[in-house]
Amino acid sequence: MQFSTVASVAFVALANFVAAESAAAISQITDGQIQATTTATTEATTTAAPSSTVETVSPSSTETISQQTENGAAKAAVGMGAGALAAAAMLL
C-alpha cells in the first residue's frame, strides 16, 4: 500500500513536469499583451485578389518584443512532487 502511494505521487509529479515542458510557447509583448506563436497552419485559397493600388508602408516602430521561453511552472511542479514525496516518506 505504501509503495503504491509513493509510486502514484511520483507518477503525478512526472506527468505534471512533462505537461509543463510540452506546452505551446507564447510570447509576451512589453506592454503586457500575450500573443500565441505563429506556428499554426492555414489552408491556401485560390481566389484572385481585387486589383487596387497599394502603397508599401515601412515599419518605423522602435518597440522591442521580449519573448518568455519558460516560466516557473516546471519548477513548481517538480517542487510540489518533491514535497509530496517527502510527505509520503514521513508516513513510512
UniProtKB/Swiss-Prot annotation:
One of its GO terms (molecular function) is structural constituent of cell wall. Induction: Down-regulated during anaerobic growth. Component of the cell wall. One of its GO terms (cellular component) is fungal-type cell wall. Belongs to the SRP1/TIP1 family. It is a lipid-anchor; GPI-anchor. Residues 1-20 form the signal peptide. A lipid is attached at residue 71 (GPI-anchor amidated asparagine). One of its GO terms (biological process) is fungal-type cell wall organization. Residues 72-92 form a propeptide. This is Cell wall protein CWP2. It comes from Saccharomyces cerevisiae (strain ATCC 204508 / S288c). Extensively O-glycosylated. The GPI-anchor is attached to the protein in the endoplasmic reticulum and serves to target the protein to the cell surface. There, the glucosamine-inositol phospholipid moiety is cleaved off and the GPI-modified mannoprotein is covalently attached via its lipidless GPI glycan remnant to the 1,6-beta-glucan of the outer cell wall layer. The keyword Glycoprotein applies. InterPro entries: Yeast_PIR_rpt (IPR000420). Keywords: Cell wall, Glycoprotein, GPI-anchor, Lipoprotein, Membrane, Secreted, Signal. The gene is CWP2. Present with 1590000 molecules/cell in log phase SD medium. PIR1/2/ repeats lie at residues 24-37. Residues 41-60 are annotated as: Disordered. It is found in: Secreted, Cell wall; Membrane. The lineage of its organism: Eukaryota, Fungi, Dikarya, Ascomycota, Saccharomycotina. The keyword Metal-binding does not apply. The record marks 33 as: Covalent attachment to cell wall glycan.
